[in-house]
Amino acid sequence: MTVLTIEEMAATLAPGQAIAGLDLGTKTIGLSMSDLGRRFATPRPVIRRAKFTIDAQALLDFAAKERVAGFVIGLPMNMDGSAGPRVQATRAFVRNMEEKTALPFVYWDERLSTVAAERTLLEMDVSRAKRAERIDSAAASFILQGALDRLSLLARSDGDEFSA
C-alpha cells in the first residue's frame, strides 16, 4: 500500500478503473464509489466500525467486490489548516492498512464535507433519522467528488482523451 498525491494517483490509474471515497468516523466508515469514467461519486452503505481487523476486512471485501483501484480518504483538518486528533487517527488507520493491501490511498482535505452533505440532505427534505444513517456516505461522496473533479482537471491539462 502506498500513500500517493492525487497527481501520482492520476498517473497510475488505467482508464476504466474506479476509486472509492472514505469518510472515517468513530462509529462508521462512510463509503462512496466513482463510476468507471471517474466523473461521478455515488454513496454506498456505511461500514459499522468494530475493531480495526474487522473494519479492514470489511473495507477489503468492499474493494474486491467493487474492483476498487484506490482510495481517497478524507483528512479532517482543522479550519486553520492544522492537524487535530482525527487527522492522527486517519493517518494511523491508513498506516495500519499498509499491511493489508497494496491499493493506494490519497489523503483529501475534507473540511466542511460533512456540513455540505448535511445541507444537501436537508435540501432534499430527508428526515433526521434518515440523515443520521446517510450522512457519512454522503460526506464520503463529497470527498470523492472533489478528488474526481481534480482528476478531471489534471486529465484536461494533460490532453487526455478521456477528459470531459
UniProtKB/Swiss-Prot annotation:
GO terms for cellular component: cytosol. SMART domains: YqgFc. It is found in: Cytoplasm. One of its GO terms (biological process) is rRNA 5'-end processing. Keywords: Cytoplasm, Hydrolase, Nuclease, Ribosome biogenesis. Pfam families: RuvX (PF03652). Its EC number is 3.1.-.-. GO terms for molecular function: nuclease activity. PANTHER family: POLYNUCLEOTIDYL TRANSFERASE, RIBONUCLEASE H-LIKE SUPERFAMILY PROTEIN (PTHR33317:SF4). Belongs to the YqgF nuclease family. Could be a nuclease involved in processing of the 5'-end of pre-16S rRNA. This is Putative pre-16S rRNA nuclease. It comes from Rhizobium etli (strain CIAT 652). The lineage of its organism: Bacteria, Pseudomonadati, Pseudomonadota, Alphaproteobacteria, Hyphomicrobiales.
